[in-house]
Each structure stands twice: as C-alpha cells, then as structure tokens.
C-alpha cells in the first residue's frame, strides 16, 4: 500500500465514519463544548482588562455593586433622619437664609481676566469710521 492510498483511506475514514455516535454521545459532547465555551467567556470576563479601563469587567461589576450598597446605606441614613425629626422648622430655615445673604467677601481682589486683550471700541480702527460711510 502506497503512502498516497493510505492518506486517502485515512481521510475518507475521518470524513465518512462507518459508525455514527449515539444521541447520548452527541448530547454529552454538546454539553462539554458549552461548558468549555462558558469557561472561556468567564476567564476573559474575570481577567482581561479592556483598553482604556484599569479593571476587568468582573472588577467593574464588583465596584458598581459596592457603590450601590453605599448609596443604599446613605438612603437608609436619610430615612432615619426623616423619622427622627432632626430637620429645622420653617422659621429656622428663614433665619438660615438671612445669614447667607449678609456674608460678603471684601478680602478677595477682583482680577481683570482680559487685561492683555485690546479693547475693540478704543482701537484706531474705529476712529476713522466716518471715512467708510458708516454711521453710529
């Protein structure tokens, strides 16, 4: 038997098997492939860091969950404050507003931000505007 005939015979057996797998074997192979695919997806989800992000997708989800829990704790604290009646009365709120209006900062010196820009109204361009027939 020559090498070419052996290769042809082997290829034929690979592509056209004499016995076909049973349904159980096919289902078992399908489950194996699905678990392998899931493992690959989860591996990437836990370890690969996308470009521009400093954490993996799993780390990002964990961080978002932690932030949600902190926000829930903050809302629980706010609800406790509502129940305790620690907020000021209406008259007290008016007093607080009056205090804010009286505050003035005299220590802050105003800075002209466009001091180095020439004023267009004072430039030489507009001095001889009557030459061009424009009226003010």
UniProtKB/Swiss-Prot annotation:
Positions in coiled-coil regions: none
GO cellular component, one term: anaphase-promoting complex
Keyword set, alphabetical order: Cell cycle, Cell division, Mitosis, Ubl conjugation pathway
Sequence ranges of Acidic residues compositional bias: 61-82, 89-115
Keyword field contains Cell membrane: no
Superkingdom of this protein's organism: Eukaryota
GO biological process, one term: cell division
Classification via Pfam families: Apc15p (PF05841)
Region entry Disordered, spans: 57-119
InterPro entries to which the protein is assigned, alphabetical: APC_su15/mnd2 (IPR008402)
Family statement drawn from the similarity comment of this UniProt entry: Belongs to the APC15 family.
Oligomeric and partner information: The APC/C is composed of at least 13 subunits: apc1, apc2, nuc2, apc4, apc5, cut9, apc8, apc10, apc11, hcn1, apc13, apc14 and apc15.
Function summary: Component of the anaphase promoting complex/cyclosome (APC/C), a cell cycle-regulated E3 ubiquitin-protein ligase complex that controls progression through mitosis and the G1 phase of the cell cycle. The APC/C is thought to confer substrate specificity and, in the presence of ubiquitin-conjugating E2 enzymes, it catalyzes the formation of protein-ubiquitin conjugates that are subsequently degraded by the 26S proteasome.
Protein name as annotated: Anaphase-promoting complex subunit 15
Organism: Schizosaccharomyces pombe (strain 972 / ATCC 24843) (Fission yeast)
Organism ancestry: Eukaryota, Fungi, Dikarya, Ascomycota, Taphrinomycotina
């Amino acid at each position: 038997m020559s090498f070419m005939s052996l290769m042809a015979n082997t290829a034929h057996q690979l592509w056209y098997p004499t016995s076909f797998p049973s349904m159980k074997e096919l289902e078992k192979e399908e489950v194996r492939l699905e678990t392998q695919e899931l493992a690959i997806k989860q591996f990437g989800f836990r370890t690969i860091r996308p470009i521009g992000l400093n954490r993996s997708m799993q780390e990002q989800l964990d961080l978002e969950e932690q932030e949600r829990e902190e926000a829930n704790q903050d809302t629980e604290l706010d609800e406790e404050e509502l129940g305790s009646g620690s907020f000021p009365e209406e008259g007290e709120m008016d007093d607080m507003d009056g205090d804010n209006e009286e505050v003035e900062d005299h220590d802050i010196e105003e800075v002209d931000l466009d001091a180095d820009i020439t004023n267009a109204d004072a430039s030489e361009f507009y001095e001889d505007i009557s030459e061009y027939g424009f009226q003010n």
